[in-house]
Amino acid sequence: MNKHTEAECKVIKSDGLEVEISSGSMTRLAGVSQGLVGAEGIHLAVANIPPGCASSPHHHVNCESAIYVSKGSGRFLTGPQLETTLDIEVGDFIYVPQGSVHQPINDSLSDPLELIVARNTPVEIVEEYEVS
């Protein structure tokens, strides 16, 4: 049996993205969010990290993340003391469990690192994390 609703599909153009957060040198723009399209269970954004820069160490209190590396390469630090280093490059997928401390780093001195980020909540709660 098919269910049909009156809800309409929406296209968000690149000039209509929602500016979200800056974490360290990383900026993130949402294309699908509660505020932008009324999403009820999903969030999709593009994160950009300039050459030689990184996000702040952080974790997401209320959601898992799935990340796709669409441009560039670098490292993805994870663990309570960011003690685990994962090399990342174009085409890689990254799974981040809820509450997992992480920090993407762009090692390139010339190319940006671009990450497509999906989450299983329309509104995320991000907490910056201080490594001791």
Which residues make up each language-model segment?
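A short beta-strand-loop-beta hairpin characteristic of the jelly-roll/cupin
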Residues: A54, C63-V90
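Ligand-binding loop in jelly-roll beta-barrel domains
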Residues: T85, E89-V90, Q98-I125
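Conserved hydrophobic/aromatic beta-strand scaffold that supports enzyme active sites
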Residues: L44-N48, A66, T85, F93-Y95, ...
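A short, N-terminal "cap"/entry segment at the start of jelly-roll beta-barrel domains
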Residues: M1-G41, S56, E128-S132
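Histidine-centered divalent metal-coordination motifs
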Residues: H58-H60, H102
